[in-house]
């Protein structure tokens, strides 16, 4: 993080960070990749940045891989219980992060992370009552206008009017209910919408990962 903007997400466990072999590394010698992974386990520097510094891969695809795997890594937190954020204040970013462009829009970066989640990974988060009614939060409608949504996400968001149930939205868009729940989870996690029970007028209180993250980095609620 820098000035409330997300630079990258990484881990000192290179296998957790990148368990597969990206096609970009197909021409890189295995021992060089192993060395880059070993360095990541010590410094946290994403292996792609190390390989780029050694001119084994180009910087542009390296930056794209850093964003891809960082968001994929962070995606695991959205469905995990008891997540707490701990921050260390430093005068400057680690040297390896100096060439990475920060993402000024936390919502945009977070949505990219949420797209990595598959339905089977939702667990109890998939247990939405089909009769529940999604409705925009206080500033949800304004925020959703600034997001770069996919066509499917934009169509889904257009159905939020405070009276349509999840089941009705799925029917209107001819969606499988599982896909509807997965898409809804993204908007709930971002606090764009909240779900109301058709049988109660009590507004549910949500303390999401996004809210805790924004408070921690000093971004407005």
Predicted regions and their residues:
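Acidic, Ser/Thr/Pro-enriched low-complexity segments and adjacent helix/loop capping patches
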Residues: 1-221
